[in-house]
C-alpha cells in the first residue's frame, strides 16, 4: 500500500517575518515562515504504514495556514517526468561524447492541488525541503526552504513580493505569425468540429522532450552538473503542469550538457542560433537519439530584448521542432514558462492579443511578461486546435508501448504497463467501473476497460463501428468482437477521386487548394485566378517551386500549381501568398493536390495520377 503522509506545517511568529530577505527567487520583501513537521498517517487499528522501498513517497499531504486560514495540499509524484529510455550526455575534455542512463524514477518532483479547490494546482520539488508554488483562491503562492542551519524553516510568499531583477519584461523573439485577423479567429472559433475531430483533439498526446544546456550556461553554474540537472528537472515539472490542461504529457527523454565546447556557434543573434540548433538537431541529434521536440538553454545574452525564439507550427519536423531559450532569470519558474511559451509556438500558437483571456492574470502566450503565467488563453487553445486539425502531426500521438514505460510498472500513472490489465489513475482519481485502481487489474468478469471496442466492461460485438470514416478518403474500422482495441486506421487507395472530383485521395486525405487556403487564411478565402500561379515561374516575390541549398528554384510552366499557393478574399484581384522565413514549406501547395485533370502534385511536379502512386 502506498504510504500517505500528513505533514502539519505550523505557522510561527518569526523575528524577520514580513521584512526583506534574499531567497533563491531573489529579494523577497514580504513573506511568512512555516516549519514542516511530518506526521505519518495511520492505518485502521492504529498501525503505522510501512516505509516504502523508495526514497520519496508517491503521495503526500501537507496542512498549513495561508493568511490565517488552514489549507491541505495534496501531492502526487510526477511519475511520467522521465521517459523509460531517458539518457544524459556530456563531453570529456578531449571531446568524447559520454552518455549514461541514470536511475531517475525515484525522483522528488510532484504535482498537486489544494483540497476542495477545483481549479487549484501545485508544482513542488521535495528534494531538499519543499520548493515550488501552489494556486489558492485565484492567487499564486511560493514556498522554499530558508537557508538556516539545523532548521526546517520555509518561507511562503507571493510573486508580487519578489523584487524584479530588472524592469525589462521578458519578450519572445517571434514576430512572424500565422493568424490573419481578430475577426478570422473569432469566426473560426464558431465552427463546429466533427465527432472525429473532437475525438482527435481529446486524445492523450505525448511529447518526448530533449533539452540541451550550452557551455555558457554550464560555466555560469560553475560546472556543477547536479545543480544544472535539478534546475532542468524543476523546469520540466512546471511545463508538465502547464500542458496537462491541453491533455499533453511532456516526458524528458534526454538531457545534454555541452560541458566541453558548444557543438554549434551559439551567438547573440537569436535567429541564427535557432537555425543552427535546428540543423544540429536534424543532422546530429536525431540519428543518435529520437525525440519529438528539442530546446537549447543558453547562457548567452541575445541581442535586444528577446529571451527565446521558436518555429511556429512545427512539432515533429526534423529541423524546426525546436526552440532556443535564454536562461535569463534566477527564478527557475520564469525560464520554465518561457520554455512552455516557445513550445506553444511549435504547437501552432501565436502571441495573445487584445480579446484573448485566461483565468489568471497573464497568459502563457503573452508577448511580454514580468510575472509568472500558468494558463493558455482562449485564443491559444483555438489556434492550437486549428493547427492540430490542419496538420495532424503524428509523433505526438505515439502512445508509449507497455515495454517502453518505467520498469517496474507503477499502478496509478494512467499507463497500462507490463503486468497490468488497466490503469485508471489513483484510487482518488479513477472514474472507471471496470478497473480496480488499487491493483490495476480488471474487475471481476470485466473483459476490458475504456478502449474503443469496450462497452460496459465487455467487448463490443463483431462489426460494431469503432472509428467512422472521416471523409471520402477514409474507411470505417470495425471491432472484431475478440478485442477491446479498434483495428489500425486504414484509408482508401491513393489516387481515388474525392469531393466530387475536386481532388484525389492522398494518405487518407483529400487535399484541394480551397481547403488549404481556408486553413492558411481563414473562412471566406478562395483560390486565386490561374494567372497568379504563373508567378511561380519566377523567383521574385513569393513565387517559387522549391528551395535548394537556400536558393529559390522556379517552376516549369506545367508545374506552376505545385509551387506556392495563391489565395484571395472575395473578389480581390491581388495575388496573395503566405510565407514564413523559418518554414520553407509553409504556404506551399500540399503534396497530392490536384493540379489538372488526372494530374496531381508529386515532388513539386504536376504528374499523371496513374504514375504518381
Swiss-Prot record:
Specify which residues bind Ca(2+) 1 according to the UniProt entry for this protein. Answer: 208, 292, 395, 398
Top-level enzyme category? hydrolase
Q: Where is the Disintegrin domain?
A: 408-494
Which Pfam families does the entry mention? Answer: ADAM_CR, Disintegrin, Pep_M12B_propep, Reprolysin
**Name recorded for this polypeptide:** Zinc metalloproteinase-disintegrin-like atragin
Here the disulfide bonds are 316-395, 356-379, 411-440, 422-435, 424-430, 434-457, 448-454, 453-479, 466-486, 473-505, 498-510, 517-567, 532-575, 542-577, 545-555, 562-601, 595-606
InterPro entries recorded for this chain?
A: ADAM_Cys-rich (IPR006586), Disintegrin_dom (IPR001762), Disintegrin_dom_sf (IPR036436), MetalloPept_cat_dom_sf (IPR024079), Peptidase_M12B (IPR001590), Peptidase_M12B_N (IPR002870), Reprolysin_adamalysin (IPR034027)
Residues noted as binding Ca(2+) 3 in the record, renumbered to the chain: 474-475, 477, 489-490
Spans annotated as Hypervariable region that may play important roles toward cell migration: 560-574
Does the record carry Oxidoreductase as a key word?
no
Q: Which residues are glycosylated?
A: 436
Localized where? Secreted
What keywords are assigned to this protein?
Calcium, Disulfide bond, Glycoprotein, Hydrolase, Metal-binding, Metalloprotease, Protease, Secreted, Signal, Toxin, Zinc, Zymogen
What protein family does this chain belong to?
Belongs to the venom metalloproteinase (M12B) family. P-III subfamily. P-IIIa sub-subfamily.
This protein's assembly is summarised as:
Monomer.
Needed cofactors, names only, are: Zn(2+)
Instruction: Kindly list the positions annotated as binding Zn(2+).
Output: 341, 345, 351
Q: Which GO terms describe its cellular component?
A: extracellular region; plasma membrane
Its biological purpose is as follows: Snake venom zinc metalloproteinase that seems to inhibit cell migration. This activity is dominated by the local structure of the hyper-variable region.
Question: In this protein, which residues make up the domain named Peptidase M12B?
Answer: 205-400
EC number(s) stated in the UniProt entry for this protein: 3.4.24.-
Propeptide regions on this chain = 21-191
Whether rRNA processing counts among this entry's keywords is no
Q: Where is this motif: D/ECD-tripeptide?
A: 472-474
Q: What GO MF terms are annotated?
A: metal ion binding; metalloendopeptidase activity; toxin activity
Cofactor descriptive note: Binds 1 zinc ion per subunit.
